[in-house]
Design a protein with these regions (language model features):
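A glycine-rich, hydrophobic/aromatic-adjacent loop/helix-cap motif
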Residues: 2-249
C-alpha cells in the first residue's frame, strides 16, 4: 500500500466543526454510541491509549488531512512528573492545528459515551474539532472523529476557565505557566522520545511522517532535523523507573 500524500484535496483550514460541550459530541457518535478519538502524540502508543481508555476498541493507524503537528503547548503534566526542564524551556507537548497543505499519520480508536466527560476534562485546554480521518489508502472513514487541536490563551481563559484567575492558577499558574500556547518552547525530552518510539512501533509510514511532518514551534524545523542537531541524544535517554511504562513508546 503506497504511503499517503499531502498533495491531494487538502482540507480548508478552520473548516472543522468545533465541539464545545458534551452534547455536541453526540453529532459525531458512531452507531452503538461510541466516539472516535484521534491520537497524534502519546496516543500513537496503544499501551498509552489503553492506560487512558482501558475499554477502547478498534485501535488503528489512519491519516488526517489538513492538519500540522507542532510542539507549541506548555504541558503541566511534565512539571507534575518532574520531567520538565524549565531552564532550557523543554516542557512542550504536542498539539495539532489546521494547515491546508499538511497531512499527518495518526491513530484512531473508539471510546464509550460515558468516557466523554472525563476526556473533555483531561484535555481541558484544547479545542475539540470534528474531523474525517482516512485510511492510508486515502479512503475517508465513514464516521467523524474528535481531535484535540490548538486553542488560544484568551479563549481558554475566558471560556474554559470562565475568566477565573483561580481556576487558571490551579491548572497552570502554580507551575509558573503564564502562557499555554507558545512558539518559543522545546519538546519535553522524555515525551518526544516516547512519541518517536510509538510512531516507530506503528511502522511505516507513521514513523517517517512523524519525523518529517512534526515541527518545533517555528513551524520549519522538523523532528528529524531536531534530533540530529539541538536534540541529539534524546533517543538514548532512559526514563526513570517509575515512568518507564508510561514513556516507553
Amino acid at each position: 500500500m503506497p504511503p499517503p500524500t499531502a498533495t491531494v484535496a487538502p482540507a480548508a483550514g478552520g473548516s472543522f466543526p468545533e465541539l464545545t460541550c458534551p452534547a455536541d459530541f453526540a453529532a459525531v457518535a458512531a452507531p452503538g454510541g461510541r466516539f472516535s478519538v484521534v491520537g497524534f502524540g502519546s496516543l500513537l502508543s496503544e499501551r498509552s491509549a489503553r492506560s487512558t481508555f482501558p475499554e477502547l476498541e478498534g485501535f488503528r493507524v489512519a491519516a488526517l488531512r489538513g492538519f500540522r503537528r507542532v510542539f507549541a503547548h506548555a504541558a503541566p503534566i511534565f512539571f507534575e512528573r518532574g520531567i520538565a526542564i524549565e531552564a532550557t524551556k523543554e516542557f512542550s507537548s504536542l498539539s495539532v492545528e489546521p494547515c491546508d497543505s499538511e497531512l499527518i499519520v495518526v491513530t484512531v480508536f473508539e471510546i464509550k459515551e460515558e468516557e466523554v466527560p472525563a476526556f473533555i476534562e483531561r484535555e481541558h485546554e484544547f479545542r475539540f474539532l470534528a474531523v474525517v480521518p482516512e485510511g492510508l489508502d486515502g479512503v475517508p472513514f465513514t464516521n467523524r472523529a474528535v481531535v484535540c487541536a490548538r486553542y488560544s490563551d484568551e479563549e481558554y481563559f475566558q471560556g474554559r476557565c470562565q475568566g477565573s484567575k483561580e481556576i487558571y492558577y490551579q491548572r497552570y499558574g502554580r507551575y509558573n505557566i503564564d502562557k499555554i500556547w507558545r512558539d518559543d518552547i522545546l519538546p519535553c525530552r522524555l515525551y518526544l522520545r516516547h512519541c518517536v518510539l510509538a510512531a516507530k512501533n506503528l511502522g511505516e509510514p507513521a514513523y517517517s511522517f512523524f519525523l518529517d511532518h512534526t515541527y518545533l514551534g517555528d513551524r520549519k524545523t522538523t523532528i528529524r532535523e531536531y534530533l540530529t542537531t539541538t536534540g541529539a541524544g534524546i533517543m538514548e535517554e532512559e526514563p526513570p523507573e517509575s515512568l518507564k511504562s508510561r514513556y516507553g513508546g
